[in-house]
């Protein structure tokens, strides 16, 4: 655990500015920058512990929402969603005085969109290599001959994490629910002795979507399972669903979910200008067709195995353009365990008994998938 900490975050709003004050355990280095589409102010700090209770966002002023968490090894991040284009008028550190600890003070004022974009462009021009350093490169695609492995490789992806909490229940946060389930599933699979299992994250940290895909490809995974929990305005809706990749969504709800999940990098303050374009070629297209077919096959097995084990959403298998499912050579699915906005689902998803039962059922589905894959070959 980090020894440095942010003990509190508070706000001050006047007609001229909105002030953010972070109380710190000690003087810390920091880096602050702005991002567009949507308008965000991003503050990077060394790894710190944050207040357990998130302060209420100001009801007026220039801030819509603030979130924070571990962004990467040795780095924490605070992301401010602004109501529109803003300028950081001042940022300064105050030393301990009058009973207060170190304080980092950030003053935001309104500005024009043109001025906002000009400041972003100026920052990027002054640090030309920073984007390259922060970019997540794609793992080059080369068709691989099918080789028999001692153990099948499975990568389990706990969605969201760190600065991105995901869906909110009355008490539970998606990032915590899915990490607990991912660990339970990994333990269940390892106990079979049949699989080499890897987690994209094993703690409360944010992993960019492209990097999650890269992890699966770097391990030469035979299966990628991304674990999530959903939320919706209609609190009566509940049940598990499973998604596979398609550029055309199966329905409006699946399309909306994909848009929401694909915003994860935006929520975490990722600069898309730093990211290389996705590569397209005929070899990738051919490989992805086979991969999609295998993904659909696995999804069907999961649906059948889960019947009677947990509540299922109507039309349980759906499809849409999820960025995290885009490995061209790794069969991939995204499983929404249930809805944190439903009190019954939230209670089940928070239960170790339910978690272990469903992890066991998913393990059985994985066993069946690889048995049928071996027979097909």
Give, region by region, the residue ranges found by the protein language model.
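C-terminal, charge/polar-rich interaction regions
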Residues: 319-377
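Signal-peptide-cleaved, periplasmic/extracellular N-terminal interaction regions immediately downstream
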Residues: 1-153
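Catalytic-core regions of hydrolytic enzymes
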Residues: 128-279, 288-304, 308, 347, ...
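Short, solvent-exposed loop/turn elements at domain surfaces
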Residues: 31-32, 52-53, 163-167, 343
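A short, glycine/Asx- and small/polar-enriched loop/turn
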Residues: 100-101, 236-238, 327-332
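Short beta-strand elements
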Residues: 89, 313-319
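Flexible glycine-/small-residue-rich
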Residues: 24-26, 45-47, 82-84, 107-110, ...
């Amino acid at each position: 655990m980090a020894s440095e900490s942010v003990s509190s975050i508070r706000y001050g709003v006047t007609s001229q500015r909105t002030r953010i004050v972070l109380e710190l355990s000690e003087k810390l280095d920091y880096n602050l920058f702005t991002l567009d589409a949507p308008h965000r102010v991003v503050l990077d700090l060394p790894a710190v512990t944050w207040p357990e209770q998130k302060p209420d966002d100001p009801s007026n002023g220039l801030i819509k929402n603030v979130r924070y968490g571990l962004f990467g090894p040795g780095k924490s991040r605070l992301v401010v969603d602004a109501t529109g284009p803003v300028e950081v008028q001042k940022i300064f550190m105050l030393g301990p005085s009058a009973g207060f600890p170190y304080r980092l003070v950030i003053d935001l004022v309104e500005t024009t969109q043109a001025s906002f974009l000009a400041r972003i462009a100026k920052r990027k021009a002054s640090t030309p290599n920073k984007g390259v350093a922060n970019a997540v490169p794609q793992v080059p695609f080369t068709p691989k001959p099918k080789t028999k492995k001692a153990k099948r490789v499975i990568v389990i992806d706990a969605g969201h994490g760190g600065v991105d909490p995901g869906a909110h229940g009355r008490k539970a946060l998606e990032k915590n629910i899915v990490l607990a389930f991912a660990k339970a599933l990994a333990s269940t699979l390892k106990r079979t002795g049949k699989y080499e299992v890897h987690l994209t994250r094993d703690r409360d940290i944010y992993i960019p979507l492209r990097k999650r895909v890269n992890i699966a490809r770097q391990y030469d995974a035979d299966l990628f399972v991304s674990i999530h929990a959903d939320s919706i305005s209609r609190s009566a809706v509940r049940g598990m669903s499973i998604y596979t990749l398609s550029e055309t969504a199966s329905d409006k709800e699946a399309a909306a979910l994909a848009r929401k999940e694909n915003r994860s990098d935006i929520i975490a303050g990722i600069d898309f200008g730093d990211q290389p374009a996705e590569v397209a070629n005929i070899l990738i297209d051919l490989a992805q067709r086979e991969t999609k077919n295998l993904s659909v096959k696995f999804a069907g097995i999961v649906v059948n195995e889960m019947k009677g084990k947990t509540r299922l959403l109507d039309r349980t298998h759906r499809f849409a353009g999820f960025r995290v499912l885009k490995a061209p050579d790794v069969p991939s699915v995204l499983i929404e365990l249930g809805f944190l906005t439903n009190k019954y689902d939230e209670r089940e998803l928070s239960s170790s008994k339910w978690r272990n039962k469903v992890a066991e059922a998913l393990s059985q589905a994985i066993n069946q998938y690889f048995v049928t894959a071996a027979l097909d070959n």
